[in-house]
Amino acid sequence: NIPAVEVYHAEAEFAFVMSKQAKHVSEADAMDYVFGYVPFFDVSARGMIRRSQLIPKGQHTFSPCGPWITTKDEIPDPYNLQVKSWVNGEARQNYSTGDMGHKIDDQISWVSKYQMLQPGDIIATGTHHDGIGPINVGDTLEIEIEKLGRARFFIKGDSPRKDIEWLAGQNKPAQPVGTPITIV
C-alpha cells in the first residue's frame, strides 16, 4: 500500500538498452555502449510527499517496456522519432525525441560517473509532459515510437478514485485513497 496516492500517471518515453559494462564513459564514446531502443512507460504515483523518486516511481510494475528491442543499427537518428501514447484509445502524448532535454550520450556519461552500468540496463530518456493524465484499473495503455513499433499494457489492481486529479498546491486527503496497481 502506497500512502496518500491520489492518482497514477503513465509517461510515454523513449528508452535505450546498454550493450556492455560502462563506468566513467565520455560523451564522445557513449553511443558505443548502446545496444538498442525500447518503448517505455514511466509510471508515477502522484500526491504523496516525496523525499526521492524511489517510492512514487520505483514500484515493481511501474516501468513496462518492450516487449522487443530495436537494435541501434536500425535507428540511424534516435533524435528524430515521434513518440505517441493512448489511454483506452484516447490520444494523450505526441512529441519528438528531438525535444529531449538530455541526449543519450550525455545521460550515459553522467550516470556512468556515479554507478556501473551493465549490459541490459534500460535508461528512459524523459518525456514531454503535455497530455499526461490519470490512469486507472481497467485502462489500456499504448505507446508507439516511430520505427520501434507499438506496445500495449493493461492496468490491474486497485487504484485511486477516478475523480481526483492532484496538482501541486491543492489540498490532499488526510487518508490514503489508493493502493498499488499492476501493469501487465
Language-model segments: residues:
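Short Gly/aromatic-enriched secondary-structure transition segments
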Residues: S26-V38
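Catalytic-pocket segment enriched in acidic/His residues
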Residues: R46-V184
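Short, basic and Ser/Thr-rich N-terminal targeting/leader segments
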Residues: Y8-A12, Y33, S63, Y79
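A generic local secondary-structure boundary/capping motif
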Residues: N1-Y8, F14, A22-D29, S52-K57, ...
